């Protein structure tokens, strides 16, 4: 049983008690807890119910209720002696962004609407983004991980050069990074933390989608600490609301680039993004707010209103548009989910 996030509710002699897991003192013979009166043809049963702290949910084969049997073992009618687990809730921010607002871009996140947003400082102090997808794993771009490293650098070489913050500048230690096996085409890497983070209203993973939310005109939110209008990194988390763009128009905009990022003076920003079947574009021509240097690795967050859940539909890969080019480029999350789940399970 994971101790993180778990609370046990005891029903003893007709009274309820909440006990933190890990508490060595569970005295069932406490004089302050009187035994209930006996009843004819009946008996008193000792029960415990496992519950989870806020921002966690119970994962169990049974209902989480355990009875003390004759062998003095706590058992569930379905799960037996197997204990439930408290797993982190994803995509349920306590203070979601106001989706009625009409000001596009440049808004400050004062409420903690993007608790999955992490800040990564790479080698030589460059700020980039990362996205919390569980209480121990984050997604970012492979290019972020390789910043100021040679193309031959290994994951072991990269790991100690990174500094990572979640929530309100909470420093977390990195155990390892895992690069996508085809990261020159699928610009993605995973970061595993040494310890699980405690999920709170300020620190919460975003869900990975099982269905494709990407369609032209669909609106998503991107947050980050990238450069602002003065080309300086901001110390306040900002966010922008952007629609998914027509992929064909995006390809034409970037001069029909279908190859890995390279210098091209005919491109609006002097370089070509990676554009392929694993990517999509988002952005507006009408407004002058956009993602910029340092925002890569952030999620294109979409709210599923039916489920009232936020999903990372994509991860920002090309963050050099900076309101000069019309579109940012994102890696499709649906193309990543199998690899992500397999990698997390193996590691």
From Swiss-Prot:
Keywords: Acute phase, Antibiotic, Antimicrobial, Antioxidant, Disulfide bond, Glycoprotein, Hemoglobin-binding, Immunity, Secreted, Serine protease homolog, Signal, Sushi. This is Haptoglobin. InterPro entries: Haptoglobin, Peptidase_S1_PA, Peptidase_S1_PA_chymotrypsin, Peptidase_S1A, Sushi/SCR/CCP_sf, Sushi_SCR_CCP_dom, Trypsin_dom. The beta chain mediates most of the interactions with both subunits of hemoglobin, while the alpha chain forms the homodimeric interface. Expressed by the liver and secreted in plasma. It is found in: Secreted. Tetramer of two alpha and two beta chains; disulfide-linked. The hemoglobin/haptoglobin complex is composed of a haptoglobin dimer bound to two hemoglobin alpha-beta dimers. Interacts with CD163. Interacts with ERGIC3. One of its GO terms (molecular function) is antioxidant activity. Residues 31-88 form the Sushi domain. GO terms for biological process: acute-phase response; defense response to bacterium; immune system process; Notch signaling pathway; response to bacterium. Disulfide bonds join 52-86, 90-207, 250-281, 292-322. One of its GO terms (cellular component) is extracellular space. Residues 259-264 are annotated as: Interaction with CD163. Glycans are attached at residues 148, 182, 256, 264. Belongs to the peptidase S1 family. Residues 103-345 form the Peptidase S1 domain. Residues 1-18 form the signal peptide.
């Amino acid at each position: 049983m994971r101790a993180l996030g778990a609370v046990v509710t005891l029903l003893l002699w007709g009274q309820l008690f909440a006990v933190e897991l890990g508490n060595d003192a569970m005295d069932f013979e406490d004089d302050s807890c009187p035994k209930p009166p006996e009843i004819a043809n009946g008996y008193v049963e000792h029960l415990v119910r496992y519950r989870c702290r806020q921002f966690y949910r119970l994962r169990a084969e049974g209902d989480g209720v355990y009875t003390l049997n004759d062998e003095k073992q706590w058992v569930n009618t379905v799960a037996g002696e197997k204990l439930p687990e408290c797993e982190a809730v994803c995509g349920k921010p306590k203070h979601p962004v106001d989706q009625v607002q009409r000001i596009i871009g440049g808004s400050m996140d004062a409420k903690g609407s993007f608790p999955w947003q992490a800040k990564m400082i790479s080698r030589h102090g460059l700020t980039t983004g990362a996205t919390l997808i569980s209480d121990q794993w984050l997604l970012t771009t492979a290019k972020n991980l390789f910043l100021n490293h040679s193309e031959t650098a290994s994951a072991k070489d990269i790991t100690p050069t990174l500094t990572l913050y979640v929530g309100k500048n909470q420093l977390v230690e990195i155990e390892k990074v895992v690069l996508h096996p085809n990261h020159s085409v699928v610009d993605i890497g995973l970061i595993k933390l040494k310890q699980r983070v405690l999920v709170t209203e300020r620190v919460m993973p975003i869900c990975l989608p099982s269905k494709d939310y990407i369609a032209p005109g669909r609106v998503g939110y991107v947050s980050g600490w990238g450069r602002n209008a003065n080309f300086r990194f901001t110390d306040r988390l900002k966010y922008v609301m952007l629609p998914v763009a027509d992929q064909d128009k995006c390809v034409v905009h970037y001069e029909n680039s279908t190859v890995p990022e390279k210098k091209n003076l005919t491109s609006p920003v002097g370089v070509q993004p990676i554009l392929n079947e694993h990517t999509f574009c988002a952005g507006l021509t009408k407004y002058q707010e956009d993602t910029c240097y340092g925002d890569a690795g952030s999620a294109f967050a979409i709210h599923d209103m039916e489920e009232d859940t936020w999903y990372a539909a994509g991860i920002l890969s090309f963050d050099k548009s900076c309101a000069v080019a019309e579109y940012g480029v994102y890696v499709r999350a649906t193309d990543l989910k199998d690899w992500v789940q397999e990698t997390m399970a193996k590691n």
